[in-house]
Design a protein with these regions (language model features):
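Extracytoplasmic gate region of multi-pass secondary transporters
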Residues: 123-176, 237
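Helix-loop-helix hairpin linking two adjacent transmembrane segments in secondary transporters
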Residues: 40-91
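C-terminal transmembrane helical hairpin of 12-TM major facilitator-type secondary transporters
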Residues: 189-239
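A late C-terminal transmembrane helix in Major Facilitator Superfamily
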Residues: 241-280
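Helix-to-loop junctions at the C-terminal end of transmembrane segments
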Residues: 177-188, 276
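Juxtamembrane intracellular "pre-TM" segments in multi-pass secondary transporters
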Residues: 94-127
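Cytoplasmic helix-loop-helix junction between adjacent transmembrane helices
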Residues: 5-46
Length: 314
């Protein structure tokens, strides 16, 4: 039953972001899309942080049944379903804008559906997918295994586990809003923002596993949240929208999300296997660091090469 519930929860989570990004793309100007994506992602950060704190306090410290967290989650989901139904709806102006597009797509469906494989997996696109895989791999490994890592290998207990783990989520909110605003302001610098943030996040992730001092560990977690996935993801998505093939943008985003979701399956399972085999999750952290570092370097190199080619053509 719990596996079926997890499957249904995953389907819901996977379907939400595509719809949310579609709404923002329809209603938000190009110059503010990174910031809009950051706001959408901030909801995930708030939910993750509150979930970690409440579960540690109510279940681990107060001894309540774990099902209590499921009931709380179900209640909040129902509230948001009502809010979406009442507040977020298709207005007449939206439908007037959408209908001609739908008709045009029907008339030209054969052209719009086919994306050349060569363009879909061009080097700069492929390395963007790999970068996103590495970014999500590190994040989902942290989200899944950090509470257990803090408890079994760093001596944290009770509510301190959830509070410490939630620092990653809460620190990501100001990071996402701050860096997305900068990226929207300096739109031609998005690659530089992405590369610098990824390198810094990699360094913080490495520091997290290497330090034994609790204060330094918490600082590293806060900085990883501030600089990591939720901060850089809006900028990557904005960059992708500018560089993806204009024909079949939906297919491109689908491939991009596939790489990210694939990491959410591999990272928890692989780290768990490493923990069972070695008795420690440290190697799982190092693997995340290496994958993220490789993805960032590949993305940086292909964009440097692309920039050089564009300059020579001019």
């Amino acid at each position: 039953t719990i596996y079926l519930g997890s499957l249904l929860a995953g389907l819901g989570c996977g379907s939400f972001y595509g719809s949310a990004y579609s709404l923002t793309s329809q209603n938000i100007p190009q110059a503010k899309k990174s910031f809009a994506t950051a706001i959408v992602n901030s909801g995930s950060a708030v939910g993750s942080g509150l979930g970690m704190i409440l579960s540690s306090y109510l279940v681990a410290q107060k001894g309540l049944p774990w099902q209590v967290m499921m009931y709380i989650s179900a209640f909040m989901i129902i509230c948001m379903l009502v809010a979406f139904q009442v507040i977020i709806r298709n207005h007449k102006e939206d439908m007037a804008l959408i209908q001609p597009t739908v008709v045009d797509e029907k008339d030209n469906g054969a052209v719009k559906e086919k994306v050349p494989f060569k363009k879909l997996f061009a080097p700069h696109m492929l390395f963007a997918y790999i970068l996103y895989f590495g970014t999500c791999y590190a994040y989902y490994m942290i989200v899944t295994w950090l509470p257990n890592f803090l408890s079994t290998e760093r001596g944290f207990q009770g509510a301190a586990i959830g509070l410490s783990s939630s620092l990653v989520a809460f620190a990501s909110i100001p990071g996402a809003l701050f860096f997305s605003r900068l990226a929207d302001k300096y739109m031609h610098k998005k690659v530089q923002f992405i590369v610098v943030l990824e390198f810094l996040a990699t360094a913080m992730l490495l520091l997290t596993v290497q330090v034994s001092n609790a204060t330094l560990l918490l600082i590293a977690l806060i900085m990883y949240g501030f600089l990591g996935k939720l901060a850089v993801e809006p900028i990557i998505i904005s960059w992708l929208g500018e560089n993806a093939p204009k024909i079949g943008i939906g297919t491109t985003l689908g491939v991009f999300n596939f790489f990210g979701m694939m990491s959410s399956v591999i990272a928890p399972a692989l780290t768990g296997k490493i923990s069972d085999t070695t008795g420690s999750k440290v190697m799982g952290f190092y693997i995340a660091v290496v994958i993220l570092l490789i993805g960032t370097i590949l993305f940086m190199l292909v964009n440097l090469k692309k920039r050089g080619a564009d300059s020579s053509n001019k």
